Curated annotation (Swiss-Prot):
A GO MF term: RNA methyltransferase activity
Keyword terms: Methyltransferase, RNA-binding, S-adenosyl-L-methionine, Transferase
Family annotation (Gene3D superfamilies): NusB-like, Vaccinia Virus protein VP39
Positions contributing to S-adenosyl-L-methionine binding: C276, A277, G278, P279, G280, G281, K282, E301, D325, D341
UniProt protein name: Putative methyltransferase Rv1407
Active site, renumbered: C394
UniProt source species: Mycobacterium tuberculosis (strain ATCC 25618 / H37Rv)
GO biological process per UniProt: regulation of DNA-templated transcription; RNA methylation
Single GO cellular component term: peptidoglycan-based cell wall
One Pfam family it belongs to: Methyltr_RsmB-F
Membrane-crossing residue ranges in chain numbering: none
Keyword Hydrolase: no
Protein family per UniProt: Belongs to the class I-like SAM-binding methyltransferase superfamily. RsmB/NOP family.
Amino acid sequence: MTPRSRGPRRRPLDPARRAAFETLRAVSARDAYANLVLPALLAQRGIGGRDAAFATELTYGTCRARGLLDAVIGAAAERSPQAIDPVLLDLLRLGTYQLLRTRVDAHAAVSTTVEQAGIEFDSARAGFVNGVLRTIAGRDERSWVGELAPDAQNDPIGHAAFVHAHPRWIAQAFADALGAAVGELEAVLASDDERPAVHLAARPGVLTAGELARAVRGTVGRYSPFAVYLPRGDPGRLAPVRDGQALVQDEGSQLVARALTLAPVDGDTGRWLDLCAGPGGKTALLAGLGLQCAARVTAVEPSPHRADLVAQNTRGLPVELLRVDGRHTDLDPGFDRVLVDAPCTGLGALRRRPEARWRRQPADVAALAKLQRELLSAAIALTRPGGVVLYATCSPHLAETVGAVADALRRHPVHALDTRPLFEPVIAGLGEGPHVQLWPHRHGTDAMFAAALRRLT
């Protein structure tokens, strides 16, 4: 089943719904990123104000809720979603999201979607869309969940995953990471559906957080001394960001970079290394803080595009950039402080990437865990005795966090430091340690993990 070829199109979707639909198609057909495609479409077409806000809600909400929407669509259509034409399926997702999770009038949600189906296809396909959406509109989300979700008593994790539109394996990974606090699972999953504030980082020695907050009409952050919150807006248009006085960076990432500089190291000679530097936000913070103690940062990044971003974000700072694989750098060992912000599944930042929860697969974990262990081993080899490695990920998956650290402790002459004091007293109540796991529902940050290791010999 493919879209038909026809004459001039009539009665297209309104601009907001059209932008949302085209973004959904880009995500489905080209593996594009909604948070990159949609803003460009809105700017190109001059869509602003309420229309832009509506398009954003439809796009990001539909991307996040895809699994739940597909289950409802499949039940209403009495066929597998995979058997439905991909273009029709995206239209159905857009319509179903409006019916179940917005206050849009049901008639408007159905009629606009059916009209677009008639433009994209023919009357028969439009009739199919009409029938499915009218069936869905006959019940609210709670009713559909009650019918389709796993039983909450027999499968609480599966039930929570369905209700909050996450793949079950991700909900299980969060539950495993929470451990004794598994009762917070629903709060973790719900936080992924909340639109996060934009976090900025004031460049140390250039601008204070207070000065930045006044310049951009934001709010000084709760934890990082560099953080400023913006409720919404395009940070790339802000003068301090354009001029290099501030960076767009989650507050948790700021705390990770700061933690490395606070780790106790006797006889610090100022040789610092960022082994996984792209896109350069943490490198810039390290270099800015390093200026206060005459430290120099070596940044390693193999990706050409990400290396270019490192160069852009660290211009004017004492940073040496090497465009090589962090596992094979040919660098002379002896670094005092090494940051390994390892490539990961990004499960801790799903709230910032609407489609990511459905794009990631369980098989990704094993490949990334292998890479993470290799990078951590390389970092330890480059660290001098008495020096510190800070290992971090923006994923709470145990294979990517405590699993990687446990592997390093078994195979290398390192000792795990209590990482909590490097975050306290800024953040209290970090648990039993020795490592730190931040959570969006507790701290308002991405779910960053951090572990500090001291090399012994």
